[in-house]
Amino acid sequence: MAGLRARGGPGPGLLALSALGFCLMLQVSAKRPPKTPPCPPSCSCTRDTAFCVDSKAVPRNLPSEVISLTLVNAAFSEIQDGAFSHLPLLQFLLLNSNKFTLIGDNAFTGLSHLQYLFIENNDIWALSKFTFRGLKSLTHLSLANNNLQTLPRDIFRPLDILNDLDLRGNSLNCDCKVKWLVEWLAHTNTTVAPIYCASPPRFQEHKVQDLPLREFDCITTDFVLYQTLSFPAVSAEPFLYSSDLYLALAQPGVSACTILKWDYVERQLRDYDRIPAPSAVHCKPMVVDSQLYVVVAQLFGGSYIYHWDPNTTRFTRLQDIDPQRVRKPNDLEAFRIDGDWYFAVADSSKAGATSLYRWHQNGFYSHQALHPWHRDTDLEFVDGEGKPRLIVSSSSQAPVIYQWSRTQKQFVAQGEVTQVPDAQAVKHFRAGRDSYLCLSRYIGDSKILRWEGTRFSEVQALPSRGSLALQPFLVGGRRYLALGSDFSFTQIYQWDEGRQKFVRFQELAVQAPRAFCYMPAGDAQLLLAPSFKGQTLVYRHVVVDLSA
């Protein structure tokens, strides 16, 4: 029987010994202390919390189950991308009294369970636009008592379920950069404690929530370099022909009148054609009865009129301009009076006279000689109040105003602009019901004059030593004045309607400009600046929203 029991299984003694050994193992195991979770020296940790003081970086060696982290008096200045991504279960994060100055994009990426984020009493002066990206569970956010002066537009957009926001204790500058916040506060369902402006003075101590949006003037403009034409030029004239936009440039350096065509696809000016012109000072396009003509005024070698032949797609010389009448042209103006086309040439030679030509059937013919012996420099045609006028500026006397006589069909001298005896160029503009003249001077200040009914009166002087070119122009309701100089960069002024004066707006790096030309090209508003010494520059007028 004993042998049978041995083969069938353990006896009672062996079973008892096994039971005793198991009990001893349990006793030994019960006496071992629990395993200590990992924790950096600067932190105090439990299984799911960590409290860190004087850390030199975001602690890395933390329990993986941590759901609550507090950082106090941290010694690093920036929280970078993914700084807490190693703590994916984090639900509570307190960053208090640290030396942070900047929190970057995606700083809290990977914290999809974070519900409470308190960033308080730090030195933070800037947050990135995507600082809070990825915090889809965040319900409470505090940015109280930092040095924030502004907030990036739509910084709170990723926080879909945010319930409470605290921005108190910051130095918010309530300028255009904060306009979006005023709009957001008016429409959000998030509870936001009252916050106040620290600046500018007119808004100081005003509650941000109560600021009227109409007080924010945040739309401005800018002229940005759009295209560089790698050649000098002394005049620029845009024109439309057969529904296409072109530009005629006088380029004595390459002995040509260059015709450029606007490419509406590439949105650039492209080479199109050239007219031989060894000493061109002005290339004036005119479209008469659907035919294109270009008047080429030259200092030497005679001046000519070219006609565009659409059949041969080339320019052919149509007629010569009498060299005894036009000796040394300096400017050319084209205009229409009572249905007839004219162009006038300012002659700057000592023995020359500004001449008027009229289109008749198949050519331009001499119509009138104006202002002889005065070395004329510029012309400006003014058609206001039904009285066409031509203003002629001269280097030897005050600008002369001629008025068109419909009886004589000629210009008749009307008077002089005595305030500026040595104007190099003359331009005009209207603002409201008032008419103004702009006169540039090479030595002395350029002048802005207003017509008072019987005479001109000076309203403004603009510093302009070395100026040979100026041009007022209107873009989308905004009036500007481009004023060039041979000794400094070009100044752009903007018209202040309240003060009825031009105020300095922008400086453009144009060397020795000889003209300025405004050219709308589709939705692009362009300002061309032909340069005598350098490249011809094309600037684009852009509208800038400072609140964006």
Swiss-Prot record:
EAR repeats by residue range: 222-264, 268-310, 314-361, 363-406, 410-453, 455-497, 501-543
TM stretches of this protein: none
Biological function: May participate in the regulation of neuronal exocytosis.
Signal peptide residues on this chain, from the entry's feature table: 1-30
UniProt keyword list: Cytoplasmic vesicle, Exocytosis, Glycoprotein, Leucine-rich repeat, Repeat, Secreted, Signal, Synapse, Synaptosome
A biological-process GO annotation: regulation of exocytosis
Domain LRRCT: 170-220
Annotated LRRNT domain residues: 31-64
Provenance organism: Pan troglodytes
Summary of subunit composition and partner proteins: Interacts with STX1A.
Glycosylation site residues: 189, 311
Name the UniProt record assigns to this protein: Leucine-rich repeat LGI family member 3
LRR repeats: 89-110, 113-134, 137-158
Subcellular localization, as worded in the UniProt entry: Secreted; Cytoplasmic vesicle, Secretory vesicle, Synaptic vesicle; Synapse, Synaptosome
